[in-house]
Design a protein with these regions (language model features):
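Basic, alpha-helical terminal appendages of large translation-related enzymes
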Residues: 228, 233, 243, 247-339
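Structured secondary-structure scaffolds
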Residues: 1-196, 238-242
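A glycine-rich phosphate-binding loop feature that marks nucleotide/adenosyl-phosphate handling sites
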Residues: 119-121, 170-171, 204-210, 299-303
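Short, glycine- and charge-enriched coil/turn segments that flank and shape catalytic ligand pockets
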Residues: 8-13, 48, 71-80, 199-217, ...
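Residue-level detector of short coil/turn "hinge" positions at structural boundaries
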Residues: 110-111, 149, 202, 294, ...
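Active-site-proximal binding-pocket segments
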Residues: 93, 154-157, 161, 167-170, ...
Length: 339
């Protein structure tokens, strides 16, 4: 393979991080030495004791040697190579998006289908460092606020692919506004109302009006769009859709005022059913982000982990009328903040 065609193939393999990867290759490929003489530690080059293998050559091969390469018929290799998505830090993007594909192309081995460089998690606009004293210990955070809270906060606040500033104060704000108020409070309110006014059952007689159809139609074509966005690592779209869905659901429940519809049971039942359906849909969507809390929320409907199907998001009558609903414990406690 000539240098020009090799360069073309390499450029074609770079599907993300164009600013870093494309510019490097478009300048023109230069020879890369795969050995070093400036130090002695490393894998010796055969027949030349003065040289050791360049660390980025032998280190990168671990991705396939761990899968039993060169035995390409091994089950591990067959199942996991080529990788659908290879996620690495942006500071080592060049080695993974240029050198590694170059090595694989030269050896006629399949390339990862996509390489994605994530950003850094910053504290006060700086990389975390013990010497600077700006480290947030993830174990301490998890012990204090819970794993789901930290996971949700990072996914929502750190735009995938970019650097993101985090702080304990912002985490607490996120827990209070999104998880405790928007999600947890909605689950508690509609469940308590249904237990009291619908005999602890999913309402039987319902009749959707324009307001109900409007909010339910937000989920009409969402499945394919979500799949497309996730395939392109657009996590922001996914989380923002959930946040907006919860905002709309709370607004719907407040605006419809089911507590003032006790003389119109058909309307009351429909409002409760619609809100419960949205709680179910959003709990399904939240499962990849806050799995433990989502499963707790689904106990309202006696649903379990294996009942979670993305395809059912568009089904507006997934819940079985007349089936029992249960009260649940508080999903997220509000964080008391000292003024």
């Amino acid at each position: 393979m000539g240098r020009k065609s090799f360069s073309t193939n390499l450029i074609n393999s770079l599907s993300v991080n164009e600013e870093t990867a494309y510019k490097f290759v478009e300048k023109g490929l230069k020879d890369l030495s795969i050995s070093r003489t400036s130090f002695s530690w490393g894998i010796p080059v055969p027949n030349n004791k003065k040289h050791v293998i360049y660390v980025w050559l032998d280190a990168l091969t671990n991705y396939i040697s761990a899968l039993k390469f060169p035995n390409t018929n091994d089950k591990l290799y067959q199942e996991f190579w080529p990788a659908d998505l290879h996620v690495i830090g942006k500071d080592i993007l060049r080695f993974h998006a240029i050198y590694w594909p170059a090595f694989l192309l030269a050896a006629k081995i399949d390339l990862p289908k996509k390489v994605y460089g994530h950003g850094w998690i910053l504290s006060g606009d700086e990389k975390m460092s013990k010497s600077k004293g700006n480290i947030l210990d993830p174990i301490e955070i998890i012990n204090k606020y819970g794993l789901d809270s930290l996971r949700y906060y990072l996914i929502k606040e750190v735009s995938f692919g970019n650097d993101g500033n985090i702080s304990q104060e912002r985490l607490e704000d996120c827990i209070n506004s999104d998880l405790a108020n928007n999600f947890g409070n909605l689950c508690q309110r509609v469940t308590a109302f249904a237990i009291k006014n619908c005999d602890s059952k999913i309402p039987k007689q319902i009749e959707f009006n324009e307001d109900d159809h409007k909010i339910l139609n937000n989920y009409k074509d969402i499945i394919e769009l979500i799949r497309e966005k996730i395939d392109n690592q657009d996590i922001n779209f996914y989380i923002n859709f959930i946040v907006n869905s919860l905002f709309e659901a709370n607004k719907y429940f407040n605006d419809q005022e089911p507590w003032n519809k006790k003389e119109d049971l058909l309307r009351l039942n429909t409002i409760v059913f619609t809100t419960l359906e949205i709680v179910r849909k959003v709990s399904f969507l939240l499962y990849p982000i806050i799995p433990e809390s989502s499963i707790k929320a689904l106990k309202i409907f006696n649903l379990k982990e294996n009942d979670i199907l993305l395809s059912s998001i568009t089904n507006h009558e997934f819940l079985k009328s007349g089936s029992e609903i249960n009260s649940i414990d508080i999903l997220f406690k509000k964080v008391e903040k000292n003024d």
